[in-house]
Structure formats: structure tokens, C-alpha cells
Amino acid sequence: MSRAPRTARAELPKGEQARHVPVLLAEVLAALSLDRPGLAVDGTFGAGGYTRALLEAGPEVRVIAIDRDPTAIRGGADLVTASGGRLRLVQGRFGDLDTLIADQDEAQADWIVLDIGVSSMQIDEAQRGFSFRQDGPLDMRMGGEGPSAADLVNGEEETTLADILYHFGEERRSRAVARAIVEARRRAPIETTAQLADLVAGVVRPEPGSPIHPATRSFQGLRIAVNDELGELVRGLHAAERVLKPGGRLAVVTFHSLEDRIVKQFFSARSGRAAQASRHVPGVERPAPKSFKLVTKGPVLPSEAETDVNPRSRSAKLRAGERTDAPAPPPLSAIEMLASLPAPQGRGPRR
């Protein structure tokens, strides 16, 4: 594990809001090593911070930027105009990036960056329903399609809700929270973020001195389930593996342990290291051809200077790898299992 030098982020624009500051930007650019003409793919466009930096890396760098959120795509129109034809914005999921770039008549990419999870823009907009700090409709959908968080909260069985909160939110009181949700929805639907946050806070007591809101883990679990975030990450890693040229590089920024575990196991297995065991994986998979070599030997963490400017960067971790000329192996089932809820095996210990 390495932390970026304190001086590495001194140039961060203090006048901008944190939502416009891409996390670990200097470290991502160093890991990608954009030293030649080529195609870069930003799989998570958001506010365009990484895309802008990719364009500025060199006049012969072309960029395809992907986002499932139509609001983000609309917000990037000016950047497309300013790019002089070097930027294409594509609405879609980065788990389909191989298909999406093929639709743009591109077969392979030289660099890919993935910034995993919800964007600051989505969190800060109350109407998107991601945050317990602002009251809004209980939505949480990144792309606006599919069941919302309210649909899950008001429609799923108690055991399924408990599993979502426990495995995706790492909420130790998951069964108690799920029970409280079911009891509350019998009286009236749970429709707003404030309703849910207050409900969870009545069950989960904050740890003394901790700044973490009691509803943090429950909101994380629901958001991951609504958007299939871990499944999307797994598909994105495999898609990147298929389209990167030999010598091409993949940089992935994660923000919590569930994401980082998947990325770590992917690079570990694909670089020839032994896959890591987990509670979901009964055994270790047979070694596959080495399709990546590690660029970062462990997670790269933000510097103190960056966390001073952007407190949301504190939990960020960067891992990166360089594609070899080995053919892409079949998808790694160990990380696919990490991305889904385990099959029911009895009630187990009380949570």
C-alpha cells in the first residue's frame, strides 16, 4: 500500500467544489502513462474530470467517455465541442464498454480508466435520492431505469432486504433494520430518503465519537443492489481485458472494500498470483494465462494534500495493470461470485 507524496496534489484548484475534482488524478495519469497517440476510454464520465485530463495529456489522444446517466452525458456537450473532434460521449454502462466502443468503430483501446461507484454530482442532488443528508425521493438509480430503492424497500421480502444490507452494505444490524423496514411499510410506504434514514437511525446506534451516520451502510447496500454496481464492475474488468491492446493500461479507482476486493482479486489472478479466498468462494481457481502485469504493486492512496481539499477522497484506492499479449481468459468466476448475494444457507447467526 502506498500513499501519494504530499506534494503530488498541491496543484488542486481550491476554488472548485469537491464534486468537480477527480480523485487521484495525478496518480491515475502516471499509472496510465499516456505517452503516445492512441484511444483512451473513460468508463465513468461523471463531471468529466478524468476525460478532460486525458484530452490534455496530448493532442493525439482520442477519448471515448461512457456514462449510464443521461444527465452526465448532457453536461458534457461543451467539452465535446471544445475537444475538436477528439471526444465522443456515449450513454451506456461501462460493463458493456467493449460493445460500446465497437459501435464507435473502434476495436481496441490503449488506456482505460474506471472510477467506481456513485458520483459526487449524484449524491449532491437531493432529487436523485442517493443521500440521507438531504431529503428527496428514495430513488438511487444512476441511469433512471429499472426498480428504484423505494421499490426494493417496499417490495422485497425481509430476508432479501437483510441480505442486501449485510452483504452489500456490510451492515451488522441488517436483520434488525430489515425487520424495522417491513414493520414500517405495513403502516405506510417508505418513499423518501429522510424516512429511511430516520428509520435506520432508530435501529443502528452510532459508535461513540464516530462521524459516520447510522444509515450510511444501509444506503450503500441499497444503492449497490439498485444499480448492480458490483456486477457492473466485474463485467467492466472483463470487458477492459478484452479490448485493451498489448501494452495498454487499465486504472481502477474504488471507494470501499467490496469494490477493492474485486479489483484486487482480478489483478491478482490475471497477473499470475494466487486468487484470494473469500467467504463466498469455496476454493481457488486454476491459474490462467497472465493477461496483465501489475503497474501498482498495491493500492495507491490519496495524499494528505488531496484529502485536505477533497475529504471524499479519503477512502479511495487506485490499482492498475498493463495488458500482456496473452489471450483474454474466460471470465473469473471467483469475482463474479463476490458480486452477487450468496445462495440462502439457513438463517445463520442473528444479525
Curated annotation (Swiss-Prot):
Family annotation (InterPro entries): RsmH, SAM-dep_MeTrfase_MraW_recog, SAM-dependent_MTases_sf
Places the protein is found: Cytoplasm
GO BP: any one term: rRNA base methylation
Gene3D superfamilies documented for this protein: Putative methyltransferase TM0872, insert domain, Vaccinia Virus protein VP39
Cellular component GO terms, alphabetical: cytoplasm
Catalytic reactions on record: cytidine(1402) in 16S rRNA + S-adenosyl-L-methionine = N(4)-methylcytidine(1402) in 16S rRNA + S-adenosyl-L-homocysteine + H(+)
Region of interest: Disordered: 274-351
Free-text function comment from the UniProt entry: Specifically methylates the N4 position of cytidine in position 1402 (C1402) of 16S rRNA.
Protein name: Ribosomal RNA small subunit methyltransferase H
UniProt organism field: Methylorubrum extorquens (strain ATCC 14718 / DSM 1338 / JCM 2805 / NCIMB 9133 / AM1) (Methylobacterium extorquens)
Name of the encoding gene: rsmH
